[in-house]
Amino acid sequence: NVVGTYNILEHCVQSGIKMVYISTDAVFDGSMGFYQADDPMSPVSKYAKSKTAAELMVRTYENSLIIRTSFFGETFPYDKAFVDQWTSKDYIDIMAPKIFSKINSNKKGISHVSSNRRSLYELALIRKKDVTPCHIRDYDYGFELPKDLSLKQE
């Protein structure tokens, strides 16, 4: 996430073109929910830390747009989903038009592209009816899973 982003950023700066960086809701630790663009980042996973580092680099270029978002493909990819993890992610066919609209705007800085806040389990049931509910406490990923990564809609 960092090296590739640096290479693209360098090209954008040299060419004088706008840099659009797709980031993630995971730059937050999930302790609060309804995160706003100016809330302090506090990543917990290795992936989130790399996205945070790349974001900090992109912020140095004034002609840039950082879009924080999160989405699944067209279906929910797992057999189980957390009932106690909150999100504002959605499916790609819902999020893509919102993302493209933001990219095509004149907006610069940091922007959140999100959907309604709901549990991961509720989101899963929209496209997959045979999902088993589960709890965060039942799994060990080597770090504390974020409980609420919902983003405030803009």
Regions found by a protein language model. Give the residues of each.
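NAD(P)-cofactor binding segment of oxidoreductase domains
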Residues: 1-20
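Active-site Tyr-X1-5-Lys
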Residues: 14, 42-70
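Conserved active-site helix of classical SDR/Rossmann-fold NAD(P)-dependent CH-OH oxidoreductases
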Residues: 5-9, 52-59, 97
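Short-chain dehydrogenase/reductase
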Residues: 36-52, 85-93, 118
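Alpha-helical substrate-binding/gating segment
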Residues: 63, 69-76, 86-115
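Active-site "gating" loop of Rossmann-like NAD(P)-dependent oxidoreductase/epimerase domains
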Residues: 3, 25-44
